[in-house]
Amino acid sequence: MTAPVALGYLDTNLFVHALYPNDPHYPRCRALLAALADGTATGWRDVVVVYELTFILARRRRFPDREAIERYLRGILAAPGVRTEDRPTLLAALGRWATRGVGFADAWLLARAEATGRPICSVNERDFGGVPNTFPA
């Protein structure tokens, strides 16, 4: 059995180009996603890439709503070849972003605060309910 091809860090554009059949990079990007899905390749997906994808894909007409974007991103994160740090927290943040109407950065900070027990320091009290907020009164 041969070892999977190590792709390194996976950039946002791979996941965007793979959505558009008329894009010149579509075939290669789809092939890379297929290799990640079947485990013949591995790559790291950083939280910054997830953030950028939530931003870009929400502004394009490819997906009807945030929940559809979340399903696409969760599908990629579930691929055997996709590696990421702190997957449970990343998935929690993605779920909050999709269902609560908050920005991904706020969803990520809240999920991290809940996972680590650390407080949030923010003027924005609305999006950080449930965790201590150390912003001075």
Task: Name what the model sees in each region.
Residues 1-45, 61-68, 126:
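Short, well-structured N-terminal submotif of metal-dependent ribonuclease cores
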Residues 21, 47-49, 71-98:
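Acidic catalytic patch
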Residues 14, 49, 89, 108-109, ...:
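Alpha-helix capping/helix-boundary segments
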Residues 38-43, 80-81, 115-119:
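Short active-site oxyanion
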Residues 54, 58-80:
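Active-site-proximal, substrate-binding regions of enzyme catalytic domains
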Residues 10, 44-45, 84, 104, ...:
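Short beta-strand scaffold positions
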